[in-house]
C-alpha cells in the first residue's frame, strides 16, 4: 500500500493548484491520500513553525504508517518545515517540497525534491 500525506501552507490549502493536482495524480497512481490541517496559525512563519510542527505531529500519530510500503510527503511553505522535520524523525526519504522555507533546509535529505 502507498500513502501520500499533504502538508499545506498557512494560506495555501490542499484545494489550491499545486497540492490539488498533486493529489489527483497520486490518486491515479493508487496512493491513499491523507491531509494535514493547520488551525489558528500566525501568518508570521517564525512564530508559527513550532505550533505547525506540533499540529502536524499530533495528526501523523493517528496514521498507521507501518501499514504502508511506501510513504510520500508533499508539502508547501510552512508545511515543508513540518514534513522535513517529521521525515527526519521517522527516517522517511520520499518528499516533494513546494517553496521550502529557510528553516526547512536543515532537515532536507539528499533524496528530497
Predicted segments, located by residue:
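Short hydrophobic segments within beta-strands
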Residues: 5-10, 74, 98, 113
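Short glycine-/acidic-enriched loop or helix-start segments at secondary-structure transitions
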Residues: 15-17, 82-85, 106-107
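Gly/Ala-rich beta-loop-alpha elbow adjacent to hydrolase catalytic centers
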Residues: 71-83, 87
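The feature captures the conserved acid-bearing segment of alpha/beta-hydrolase catalytic domains
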Residues: 100-113
